[in-house]
Amino acid sequence: MVRMNVLADALKCINNAEKRGKAQVLIRPCSKVIVRFLTVMMKHGYIGEFEIIDDHRAGKIVVNLTGRLNKCGVISPRFDVQLKDLEKWQNNLLPSRQFGFIVLTTSAGIMDHEEARRKHTGGKSLGFFF
């Protein structure tokens, strides 16, 4: 079966494992976008460490879960998010003001919406987590 959206598959795997109360989850295939998204999640403490396993194919990622994640998902299609529209997206996707993050891909790399606001840059929306 062909995977259409590897980021959506990865986030759904993490979501399902978190709901079941698992300690670890295996994600395959591995991609740069997934690794950067997981790095943003790890920076904010929603997941633990993750390890990239190179199997000379598509690669695998083993993610340690902390039990802090409530929901994560992908935003499809990847809408353009301007700096002035960031507040509107925040109200639509996140449960409250100081809770959760929207992940954007910008010209300065993949980052959360607060870092994008500090760097004064917009981009395309990848997903969210809280």
Swiss-Prot record:
<dbReference type="GO" id="GO:0005840">
    <property type="term" value="C:ribosome"/>
</dbReference>
<dbReference type="GO" id="GO:0005737">
    <property type="term" value="C:cytoplasm"/>
</dbReference>
<dbReference type="GO" id="GO:0042274">
    <property type="term" value="P:ribosomal small subunit biogenesis"/>
</dbReference>
<dbReference type="Pfam" id="PF00410">
    <property type="entry name" value="Ribosomal_S8"/>
</dbReference>
<dbReference type="GO" id="GO:0005730">
    <property type="term" value="C:nucleolus"/>
</dbReference>
<comment type="subunit">
    <text>Component of the 40S ribosomal subunit. Part of the small subunit (SSU) processome, composed of more than 70 proteins and the RNA chaperone small nucleolar RNA (snoRNA) U3.</text>
</comment>
<dbReference type="GO" id="GO:0006412">
    <property type="term" value="P:translation"/>
</dbReference>
<keyword id="KW-0963">Cytoplasm</keyword>
<dbReference type="GO" id="GO:0003735">
    <property type="term" value="F:structural constituent of ribosome"/>
</dbReference>
<dbReference type="GO" id="GO:0032040">
    <property type="term" value="C:small-subunit processome"/>
</dbReference>
<dbReference type="InterPro" id="IPR047863">
    <property type="entry name" value="Ribosomal_uS8_CS"/>
</dbReference>
<keyword id="KW-0539">Nucleus</keyword>
<keyword id="KW-0687">Ribonucleoprotein</keyword>
<dbReference type="InterPro" id="IPR000630">
    <property type="entry name" value="Ribosomal_uS8"/>
</dbReference>
<comment type="function">
    <text>Component of the small ribosomal subunit. Part of the small subunit (SSU) processome, first precursor of the small eukaryotic ribosomal subunit. During the assembly of the SSU processome in the nucleolus, many ribosome biogenesis factors, an RNA chaperone and ribosomal proteins associate with the nascent pre-rRNA and work in concert to generate RNA folding, modifications, rearrangements and cleavage as well as targeted degradation of pre-ribosomal RNA by the RNA exosome. Required for proper erythropoiesis.</text>
</comment>
<keyword id="KW-0689">Ribosomal protein</keyword>
<protein>
    <recommendedName>
        <fullName>Small ribosomal subunit protein uS8</fullName>
    </recommendedName>
</protein>
<dbReference type="InterPro" id="IPR035987">
    <property type="entry name" value="Ribosomal_uS8_sf"/>
</dbReference>
<comment type="similarity">
    <text>Belongs to the universal ribosomal protein uS8 family.</text>
</comment>
